[in-house]
Structure formats: C-alpha cells, structure tokens
C-alpha cells in the first residue's frame, strides 16, 4: 500500500545502497509543538466537516483539498527538515554550482544534490544512477509544467504562505544555519506538491481501484480520495526525501524505518484499508457511501501512524522474514 | 514420535469435524413429527358436530396483500373499504384481520401454512430447492382442500402454479401461471381474471382459488411505493367487487365464503423471505353478505400503524381450522391453528335455522372443542412423554414457573374441569367459561407447537459446538508451533481467522462475505509484495530452495508480481457481483460479456487452447457440445469418459515413473492430471466463468515465481479457494446455488451424481486452486504436507465453530432462517466436501497405495 512514483524502476542500481535514516522532527519548540497539534488539527477538520462530507463528498473533498495541502505544507515547512538540509554537510555549496540553466532548474538541483550526496550517503558511495534519474524527473517536470487547472494553485499558495512560516525562522536559526533556509524550504515544498499532484495522486488512485474502489463509476470520488491520501502520504515524504531513489525503493517495499513521516504515510494506507470495513453493513447510513469511510480511515490512520512512528516504533522496520522452514521448526521441538 | 502423534491428532480432528456437524445439525434442524392420515369427525363429547355455515369457498390470494395495502387510507382497495353507500368492512360484510405469516415468507411454505395449518420448517425450504423431489407436495398431507375433495367437492384453481406443484392432480379445472417473468405485471393477472366470470356462473365447484401474481411482481421489480402498485390495487379491488356482487346476486353462491388473503407481505425494498414486520403482516378478510347479520362494525380506512398490525392479529395457520369449521369439515390433523373467535358468532345466528339446539352455545363450544382435541392430538404426537389424562392431574399447575408444555397441560386440565363442572346443561355463563378455558388451551398449545417447529435441541447444539471446539484445540497446538516459526504469516492467518469468526455474528457480513475475502486477500497481496519486493534488494535471492516442482511456467516476476496479482484480483472481484447489497451492480459476466460476445468467445478459445498437450481433447469438448442435439448426452458422457481415462492414466503414469527413472519428459503426470482436471472443471463451469481460469493461470504463474514458504503456500491456497468461490458467483444465499451444470451427461435423476456435479460446478474454482496449489507444493516433503493439512484443519474447524456459535447464540435472531442457516449449510459443504474430500483426501499420495 505504498505510494510509489516510478522512480525506483528507473533507478535500479545494482548495489543495495544503505538507506536514509529515520527523520526527526526539527528540534525546536515550535516544531515540536506543532507536530503534536498537526494530526489533531487534521482530525478536528475532518470531524468538523464530516456532515458536509457526507452530504456532498465530491464538493467537500474538492474544496477542502487546497486547505489540506496548505496545512500539510505548513506542517512540513515548520516541522521537518527539507530534502538536502544537511547539518553536517558542506557539499551543499558545491551543489549550488550546478545551477546553470533556468531558474527553476537550478533550484531543483539545489534540492536534490545535497540530499543525494551529503545527508543520505554519509558513509557510502553515492548512487549516481539514482541521482541522475532523480534530476531527470525534476527537469522533466519543470519543462512540462502541470497541466491540471485546479491543483497547480497549491504551489503558489504555498509561496504566498511562506511569510507566515518565515516568522518561525528566528527560532529555527538558533539551531540551524540562517542563510537560505527560507529558500531551502520553499523549493522542496513546491517540489513535493508538484510530485504529489502528478505522481502520487494517480498512483494512489490506481491503488484505490486495485483495492476495490469502483472502476466504472464514482470517478471524481476515487480521484479526490486518492488526492487526499496523496497529500497526506506523499507531501512530507517528498519534502523530506526529495526523489532519492533508495528511499523510494524502500517505500515501494514498505520497509522504511519508522518515523513520523513514514509512519503517517503507512498509517494512512492501512487506515484506508480498514476504512472499508463498515461499507458492507446493512445499516443504510449515508456515511457508508464509498469514499467517506475510506477517507476517515485514512485520516485516523495518518494520525495514529504519525504518533506511533514518532514514538514507540521509531526507527523500526516492517520486516517479513520467517525464522525457519518447517523442517527446521520440527527439529527445534 | 512427536511427528507421529501430531499426525494422529490431525486425523482425529478431521474425523471430529463431520461428527460435530452431524450432532449440531440434528439439534439445529429438528425433525418435525407429522401425523399421517386424514382427519375425520369424531363423535364424543357433546356428540355433535357444528354444522357448516358455508359450503363453498372462494379464495382470492394475492402475493403482497400487506395489510396496509388493504386497510390504510392510501390503499387502492376502495371497494373493500367502501361498498355502495356503505363500506364492505364498515358494513360488516367483511371481517378484517392481520394474519401473521412466520418466516420463511416465500410462497410455497406460506401456502403450506394456509392449507395444512402447520408451521413450515426450514427443511421445507431446503426440500423445495430440489424441484424433482416429490416429497414436498401436499398430496398425502391433510389439508382442507383434501377434506373438501374427500367430501366430494370439486376444486378449481387459477393463478400461481405453485398450487399445481403442491397439489398435483387435485384440481378439477386449473390454469397455472408461472411467475418466471417478474417484469410481467399484467398478463399474469389477466390470465386469472378472464376465468372469473365463467367460473362464477358454474355451480359445480366447492373451492375456487385465485392466486394473483401481479402485486408480487411489481413489488420485486419496482418496490411497494411504485406508481404501478396503486393501479394494481384498483384492479384487485374491482375483482373483489365483481366477486362480491356475484355473491349477492347469484343464487348458487348464497352459501359461499369469500376469503381474501395474502400469503406474505413485503419489505421496504419490495422483497420478501425474511421476517420483518412488512413481510409477516399480510391481510386476511372473510367476506360474505351473511356477515352483515353479525353486526360487527369496524372502521375503515383506518389510521396507518407503523407496526402494520391492523384490526385483530391472528396467525396465518388459523385460516385452516376456521375454514374447516365454517365449511363443516374436520380440522386437518397437523393444523396448529385456532378457530378465529370472531367467526364463532356465525353459529349464534346460524343456529336459528337449525332447530336441533335450544341455544347457540353448544355449537360454539363444540367447534372449539373439536379444535382443541385436534390440537391436543398434535401436541401428543410431538410430546409423547406427557400425559393428558385427567386423573393424573399434577399439582404443578399451582406453581408459578411453568415450562410451555406444562402450561398446555394445565390449560387442558382446566378445560376438562370446567366441562365436567358444567355437565350437560350449558347456560350462558358456564359456556362462556368453557369457551375462555378452551381458547386459553388452544392459544397455549398453538404457541407451544409453533415454537416446536423452530425449537432447537440446545444440548445437541452445545455438544456439536464443543466437539468442534475440541477439534480446534487438537489442531491448535501443532498449528501454533508451525505458525510461531513463520511469525508474520502466522499473525496474518490468525488475524484473518479471528476477524472472520467475529464477522459470522453479523448478518450483513455473512451476506457480503465475499467482501471480506477480497479485502483480506488484498492484504495478503501486500504482504507478499512487502516480502518479495524486499527480497529483491535485500539480496536474499539465494533462497531458491528445491527446484520448484513441476510447474511448467516459471518466469521471474519478482518486482511487479504482487502488483500483477493485485490487478488480477481486481478483475476477479468484478467477475460476478454477489451477495445482497451490491448484487445488482454491473459485473463482467452480467454486463460486459453480454455486450461483448466476441471477447467472450476469444477468451474461451484462449482458455481452451491453454492446455496445449490436450488440445485434441479440449477441441472435442465444444464440438461434442455443438454437434447434434440428439446425442448431446452421449457426447457429454464421452468427454467425461475421456477425461476420467486421462486422470487414471496420469495416476498410473506417475506410479510407473516413480519406479523406473526420474526426469525426462516435459509434462510430468501430475501436471497432466491437473490439466485434465482443469478441462473437467471448465466443462462444469458456467460459460461466462471459463475465461476466469485464464486469470487463475496468470496468478499461479506469479505465485510460482515467488517461491513462497510452506505456510505462505497454505494461506495462499486457502485465500484463493474462498476468493474464487465468490468470484464465480457463489454466495451464502441458497438462491445462488447453480444447478445449470448439475445434469451434464446424466440421463436420469440420481441424488448422488447430481449432488456431486452440483458441488463441482459450484466449487469449480476452489477445486482448481486446491489442485494447482498442490502442484505448486509438489516439492514438499511429508512434514510440510502435514503442516499444510494442519493449518487447513485449524482454519476449517475454527470457521465451523464460529458459524455454529453464531447460529446458537443468534437462534432467535430475525434472520436466523434467511441468513445464518444458509450460511451454516454452506459451511457444511465447505467443511465436509471442500475441506475433507478435496483438500485433505487430495493431499494423500494415492500413488503410495497403488504401489502396495
């Protein structure tokens, strides 16, 4: 149930690279406080708008999507380290040198390269092919800007939003480098929203259909449900990891070490899966209609996964390895 | 040592499973004792039989005379409510009741209730499925129809041909209408109405039955609030008015009783079968101009009641003794009805014309007394150990807490007491006392006997439950040992079993069971994906294990294997819509194939050419089916013979191959066996389901490439069996049993062969998966096979026990006969045939036996 942009397939490196470590919430008070509030805020929003959601799912989902994206962007920019924001990394300056072509192109290089070289692979040789493909994708995105009419507004909205987040910077600065933080945060945010719209939404929609969402009817519902889930799962993942091939391979295999970001993403999907449970009941309630329970499950799963990933399960991986074969098992007895 | 012991425990557990089913079933489906023979008038107490008030009966029956249709203000029955200047009901010419129809509210059991007066059991419903079964007819049961015929009367029937099936050869004139075309709202009824004017002029019949289907069809098709409903009610009303006018005018109809009754109602959706208030509350009207003398006054139309109980509520079974009494017939032996007290008043006035008695009291009392004696006979038949002799009157009657049968006993003793006390001279006070004592006894006995029909032998239920519980505990520890070693898969299985077991207690989840399997199997796909996608770059590919058996196709699809599986599951999920809630939604067989015939045939030919080495034979199959229809049977048999020969060959070839040399030869015998079986299953499947076997093949290919561990193979096999059963259109409703392929190659009806073919055609997909996964596991050693059986047994025993527990705890649930009992029947099939015969016996290596 992982959200999977096709980048892993492009970046099938022969070596098994060491993965990125689990992500910590930024160690300042505002971040820590907001990280506590954010999932509650999302659930409160859902609870508040629940009746409207039941009354007209499509309109409600559509109108709330920008708000959700905004909230998520605010959250990631407040609480999470953007892709490439390495504390112990000075190669980020060398990455800046790659900025040669267009404005946007250069910034994407800024986002990606440090993530690749510095933070993610402290002690291992970098995966060139992964890096290359990642850059390629971003270039492609910039060359062919998103065609969709409603959703591209989010990046701009997030840009408009930045003054708000800027206020957080003085406190941030106590722990982090001051210069360029705003830019460093803005660009991964834009990238994450773009990729969420273009890649994660279709992937999650397809997953929803594979898991039994109607194929021939309810298209807007499924798509919007997929979009909401994509915003919940992928915004933070992309913001934090960029298009790091090895991370996305782990996501595809659902074996990221648990942290708030991955826990929330996995929790969203598992929650959506459990959200299907009440649908067959014969209670004939309006909220049993298709996307509502799934979405509620996803939101609850998000919050639960978020909390668990931060705390109890932090750093643990979902592993499926059997300890022995039957014969061995018998011998053990 | 330990291995040997666990082997025996598994064997014992598998023996316990059918035993627990037998014990539980004997308690759950109690056999109802029916008295045989026909009732005759007895001349004992009082020495007098109340004379019949009527000598003819005209029964107008229409499905769905839900009482609010007839009685409420929104009803279209204007005439029934209003007659001339007055009202039919208000004038007292019609005595209105609500007749409680107990579940199952489908036509045939209801007709049984109306004619015999007995309460049909769930077994009747099962027996009714086997249409060829003639034991479900009422030819040899005591009914008021049979009594009327025995008296020399002629019977006439127009309408629903269920009557003709129930009473073959009983009717003098009849014109049956099949209710096959549910969308026909008019012709079915016109076919009845056109006979009425003629029949009303005839004076040879003594019972004239009209059974209209239009209301039923409209209900099924458009629901109770459809615009067709009100016009149909007006049409019915005009029939009532026509008949009533004839009753008033025609001389030979002067002593005719006109009964208008519904066999069952309908729920809000327009369907019936269950026991919601709407379904169990049909209307009952006794109409005759004679009733006006009773001067009963009822308001009509009445206010709408939410519980639909209009006027006095009686049991539907009460129709039988009432009709019998009014017509002067003996009450049918097995009737559990009570003469409707309101109609006793007929003898108050009728007595004036009969000079024999000084007062009307005796007739009323005699009527009730006869009813009581008949019911007492039925009670004695069911409770032979209880005595009803007066001299043995026990003291228990004074105690407060009486069980039902004791209450009946005491009521009867009270009757005897009052009868003895009053002696022969009935003054009005004494007779009213006797009457009330009799009615008390009758009601108690009716309650007792009606519940006896659905009365469970609780001890047997618990014994059955504990036997299956014991089977679980036998398998639990060996299975737990296995599952702990495969922790994630074991946890998944545990989760699946637990959630399934809790699900069995919710009626809608039982109805929508397919959703659970689709849901859990997608979870399993994710599990496989996480495991094997992880393996890919977790550099543990060396885990190849022994060469993967005989499975012919083995492309490596490690990366997107699970995704492809997910897609194939999605296709299967939509193959057939099943269950209740979403059954009407479009699916592949129902919506896609009809409009894409070419695709279907292309897929069919693809499926046929899928087993290349048997192309000759598979080519034969359609040819055999398509040549001349004269010898279709012969051809089908030939194909069956060919297939069975191939199967036997494959078994022997396997033996030969083992003994001589290994390797060589592209198609190992076990594969040939599987392919032959596939061919046979294709033949036994619905045409539209055949292409699904292609999907299965894709799935097994992917699964083969995954190198699953033992427990994973077992879980996969298990999930696939259930998923594909539902994907092929199976459900937990008895109506979904497909018998279209049950007669392939059979000339005459044989319970055993037809039963086996019915099972195979309904369980074709699970059987295929058992065979395919066996092939997948062909490299397994003995311990692994044993582990497979252990886990399967644990799963089956747990499912069985949870279904039994659900049936036991929910035995008074509204849906016990419509949802839980069918589920229990299906579980029997899963456990007895699919688990024990197909899975467990299929696991035994038959080649070992041949070697000996």
From Swiss-Prot, chain B:
Residues the record marks as carrying a glycan: 191, 420, 576
Biochemical pathway: Glycolipid biosynthesis; glycosylphosphatidylinositol-anchor biosynthesis
Q: How does it sit in the membrane?
A: Multi-pass membrane protein
InterPro entries, per database record = Alkaline_phosphatase_core_sf, Phosphodiest/P_Trfase, PIG-G_N, PIGG/GPI7, PIGG/GPI7_C
Of the GO CC terms on this record, one is:
endoplasmic reticulum membrane
User: Which superkingdom, per the lineage?
Assistant: Eukaryota
Query: What keywords would UniProt list here?
Result: Endoplasmic reticulum, Glycoprotein, GPI-anchor biosynthesis, Membrane, Transferase, Transmembrane, Transmembrane helix
EC code(s) of this entry = 2.-.-.-
Q: Where are the transmembrane segments?
A: 458-478, 486-506, 516-536, 632-652, 676-696, 714-734, 750-770, 787-807, 824-844
Keyword Plastid in annotation = no
Q: Where in the cell is it found?
A: Endoplasmic reticulum membrane
Q: Which residues form a coiled coil?
A: none
Matches recorded under Gene3D superfamilies: Alkaline Phosphatase, subunit A
> GO molecular function of the protein, one example?
CP2 mannose-ethanolamine phosphotransferase activity
**By its UniProt entry, which Pfam families does this protein fall under?**
Phosphodiest (PF01663), PIGO_PIGG (PF19316)
From its record, what is one biological process in GO terms?
GPI anchor biosynthetic process
Q: What functional role does this protein have? A: Ethanolamine phosphate transferase involved in glycosylphosphatidylinositol-anchor biosynthesis. Transfers ethanolamine phosphate to the GPI second mannose.
For this protein, the record's PANTHER family field holds:
GPI ETHANOLAMINE PHOSPHATE TRANSFERASE 2 (PTHR23072:SF0), PHOSPHATIDYLINOSITOL GLYCAN-RELATED (PTHR23072)
State the similarity comment: Belongs to the PIGG/PIGN/PIGO family. PIGG subfamily.
Entry protein name: GPI ethanolamine phosphate transferase 2
């Amino acid at each position: 149930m992982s959200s999977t942009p096709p980048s892993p397939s492009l970046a099938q490196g022969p070596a098994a690279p060491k993965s990125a470590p689990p992500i910590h919430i930024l160690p300042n008070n505002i971040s820590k406080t907001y990280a506590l509030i954010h999932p509650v805020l999302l659930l409160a929003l859902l609870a508040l708008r629940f009746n409207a959601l039941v009354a007209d799912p499509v309109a409600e989902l559509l109108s709330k999507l920008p708000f959700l994206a905004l909230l998520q962007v605010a959250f990631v920019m407040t609480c999470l380290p953007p892709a490439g924001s390495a504390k112990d990394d000075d190669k980020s300056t060398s990455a800046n040198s790659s900025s040669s072509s267009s404005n946007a192109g250069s910034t994407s290089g800024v986002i990606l390269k440090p993530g690749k070289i510095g933070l993610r692979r402290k002690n291992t040789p970098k995966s060139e092919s992964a890096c290359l493909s990642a850059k390629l994708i971003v270039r492609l995105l910039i060359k062919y800007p998103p065609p969709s009419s409603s959703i591209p507004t989010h990046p701009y909205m997030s840009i408009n939003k930045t003054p708000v987040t800027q206020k957080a910077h003085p406190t941030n600065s106590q722990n982090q480098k001051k210069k360029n933080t705003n830019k460093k945060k803005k660009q991964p945010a834009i990238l994450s929203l773009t990729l969420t719209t273009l890649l994660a939404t279709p992937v999650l929609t397809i997953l929803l259909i594979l898991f039994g969402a109607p194929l021939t009817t309810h298209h807007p519902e499924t798509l919007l449900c997929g979009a909401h889930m994509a915003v919940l799962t992928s915004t933070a993942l992309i913001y934090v990891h960029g298009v790091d091939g090895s991370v996305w391979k782990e996501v595809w295999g659902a074996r990221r070490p648990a942290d708030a970001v991955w826990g929330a993403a996995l929790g969203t999907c598992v929650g959506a899966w459990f959200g299907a449970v009440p649908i067959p009941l014969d209670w004939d309630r309006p909220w049993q209609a298709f996307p509502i329970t799934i979405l509620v499950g996803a939101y609850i799963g998000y919050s639960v996964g978020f909390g668990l990933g931060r705390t109890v399960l932090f750093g643990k991986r979902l592993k499926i390895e059997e300890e022995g074969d039957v014969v061995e098992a018998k011998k053990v007895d | 040592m330990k291995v040997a012991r666990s082997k025996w425990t598994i064997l014992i557990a598998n023996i316990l499973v059918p035993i627990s089913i037998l014990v539980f079933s004997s308690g759950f489906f109690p056999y109802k004792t029916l008295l045989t023979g026909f009732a005759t008038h007895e001349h004992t107490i009082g020495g007098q039989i109340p004379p019949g008030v009527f000598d003819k009966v005209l029964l107008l029956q229409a499905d769905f005379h839900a009482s609010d249709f007839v009685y409420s203000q929104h009803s279209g029955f204007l005439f029934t409510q209003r007659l001339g200047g007055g009202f039919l009901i208000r004038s007292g010419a019609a005595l209105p009741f609500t007749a409680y129809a107990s579940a199952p509210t489908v036509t045939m059991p209801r007709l049984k209730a109306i004619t015999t007066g007995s309460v049909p059991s769930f077994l009747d419903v099962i027996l009714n499925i086997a249409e060829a079964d003639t034991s479900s007819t009422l030819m040899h049961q005591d009914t008021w129809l049979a009594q009327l015929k025995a008296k020399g009367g002629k019977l006439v029937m127009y309408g629903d041909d269920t009557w003709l099936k129930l009473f073959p050869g009983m009717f003098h004139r009849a014109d049956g209408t099949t209710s096959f075309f549910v969308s026909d709202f008019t012709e079915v009824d016109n076919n009845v109405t056109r006979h009425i004017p003629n029949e009303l002029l005839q004076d040879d019949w003594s019972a004239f039955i009209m059974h209209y289907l239009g209301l039923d069809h409209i209900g099924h098709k458009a629901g109770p609030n459809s615009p067709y409903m009100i016009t149909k009610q007006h049409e019915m009303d005009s029939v009532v008015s026509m008949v009533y006018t004839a009753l008033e005018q025609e001389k030979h109809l002067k002593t005719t009783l006109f009964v208008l009754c519904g066999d069952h109602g309908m729920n809000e959706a327009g369907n019936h079968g269950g026991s919601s208030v709407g379904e169990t509350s049909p209307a009952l009207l006794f109409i005759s101009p004679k009733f006006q003398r009773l001067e009963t006054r009822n308001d009509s139309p009445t206010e709408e009641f939410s519980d639909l109980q209009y006027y006095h509520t009686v049991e539907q079974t009460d129709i039988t003794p009432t009709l019998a009494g009014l017509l002067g017939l003996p009450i049918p032996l097995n009737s559990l009805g009570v003469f409707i007290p309101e109609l006793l008043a007929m003898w108050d006035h009728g007595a004036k014309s009969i000079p024999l008695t000084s007062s009307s009291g005796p007739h009323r009392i005699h009527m009730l007394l006869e009813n009581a004696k008949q019911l007492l006979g039925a009670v004695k038949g069911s409770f032979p150990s209880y005595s009803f002799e007066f001299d043995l009157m026990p003291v228990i009657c004074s105690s407060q807490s009486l069980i039902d049968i004791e209450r009946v006993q005491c009521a009867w003793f009270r009757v005897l007491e009052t009868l003895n006390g009053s002696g022969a001279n009935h003054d009005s006070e004494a007779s009213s006392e006797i009457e009330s004592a009799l009615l008390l006894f009758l009601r108690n006995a009716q309650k007792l006997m009606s519940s006896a029909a659905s009365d469970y032998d609780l001890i047997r239920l618990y014994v059955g439950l504990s036997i299956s519980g014991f089977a679980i505990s036998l398998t639990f520890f060996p299975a737990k040992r296995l599952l702990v070693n495969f922790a994630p898969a074991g946890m998944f299985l545990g989760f699946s079993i637990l959630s399934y077991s809790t699900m069995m207690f919710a009626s809608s989840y039982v109805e929508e069971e397919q959703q659970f399997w689709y849901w859990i199997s997608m979870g399993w796909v994710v599990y496989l994906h996480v495991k094997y996608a992880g393996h890919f770059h977790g550099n543990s590919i060396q885990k190849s294990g022994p060469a993967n058996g005989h499975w012919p196709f083995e492309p490596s699809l490690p990366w997107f294997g699970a995704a492809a599986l997910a897609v194939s599951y999605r296709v299967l999920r939509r193959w057939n819509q099943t269950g209740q809630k979403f059954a009407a939604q479009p699916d592949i067989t129902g919506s896609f194939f009809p409009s894409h015939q070419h695709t279907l045939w292309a897929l069919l030919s693809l499926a046929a050419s899928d087993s290349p080495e048997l192309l000759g034979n598979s080519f034969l199959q359609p040819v055999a089916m398509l040549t001349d229809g004269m010898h279709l049977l012969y051809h089908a048999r030939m194909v069956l013979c060919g297939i069975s020969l191939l199967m036997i060959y494959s078994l022997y070839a396997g033996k030969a191959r083992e003994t001589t040399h290994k390797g060589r030869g592209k198609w190992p015998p076990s594969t040939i066996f599987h392919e032959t079986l596939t061919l046979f299953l294709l033949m036994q499947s619905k045409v539209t389901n055949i292409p699904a076997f292609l999907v299965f093949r894709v799935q097994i290919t992917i699964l083969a490439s995954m190198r699953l561990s033992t427990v994973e193979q077992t879980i996969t096999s298990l999930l696939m069996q259930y998923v594909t059963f539902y994907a092929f259109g199976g459900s937990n409703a008895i109506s979904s049993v497909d018998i279209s392929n049950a007669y392939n190659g059979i000339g005459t009806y044989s319970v055993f062969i037809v039963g086996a073919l019915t099972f195979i055609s309904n369980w074709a997909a699970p059987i295929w998966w058992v065979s395919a996964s066996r092939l997948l596991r062909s490299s397994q050693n003995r311990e692994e096979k044993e582990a497979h059986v252990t886990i399967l047994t644990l799963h089956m025993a747990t499912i069985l026990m949870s279904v039994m527990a659900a049936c036991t705890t929910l035995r008074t649930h509204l849906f016990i006969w419509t949802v839980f009992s069918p589920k229990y029947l299906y579980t029997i099939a899963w456990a007895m045939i699919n688990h024990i015969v197909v899975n467990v016996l299929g696991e035994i290596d038959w080649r070992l036996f041949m070697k000996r």
